């Protein structure tokens, strides 16, 4: 993904993309995650290991394309992190 965004999502802030999600996890800002169902598992290993330690809830979205469109970007989104 070429640009990461911070925007409003159902009155919550969120970040889009793997790099931004990892940054938010490192800062303990993540309240929950939305992961596209068609994402390659090896891309999510670092994220999944961190969220298991922090008990962060995870939801799944039907596809990367649909997730990107739902959050208002014109590219695929593998992951969206809702932040504090």
Swiss-Prot record:
GO terms for molecular function: RNA binding. Transmembrane segments: none annotated. It comes from the Bacteria. Keywords: RNA-binding. The keyword RNA-binding applies. The keyword Cell division does not apply. SUPFAM superfamilies: L30e-like. Coiled coil: none annotated. Belongs to the eukaryotic ribosomal protein eL8 family. This is RNA-binding protein SAOUHSC_00526. It comes from Staphylococcus aureus (strain NCTC 8325 / PS 47). The lineage of its organism: Bacteria, Bacillati, Bacillota, Bacilli, Bacillales.
């Amino acid at each position: 993904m070429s640009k990461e965004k911070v925007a409003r999502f159902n009155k919550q802030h969120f970040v889009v993309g793997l790099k931004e999600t990892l940054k938010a996890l490192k800062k303990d800002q993540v309240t929950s995650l939305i992961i596209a169902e068609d994402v390659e598992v090896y891309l999510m290993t670092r994220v999944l290991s961190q969220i298991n330690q922090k008990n962060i809830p995870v939801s799944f979205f039907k596809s990367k394309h649909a997730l990107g469109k739902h959050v208002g970007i014109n590219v695929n989104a593998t992951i969206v992190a809702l932040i504090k």
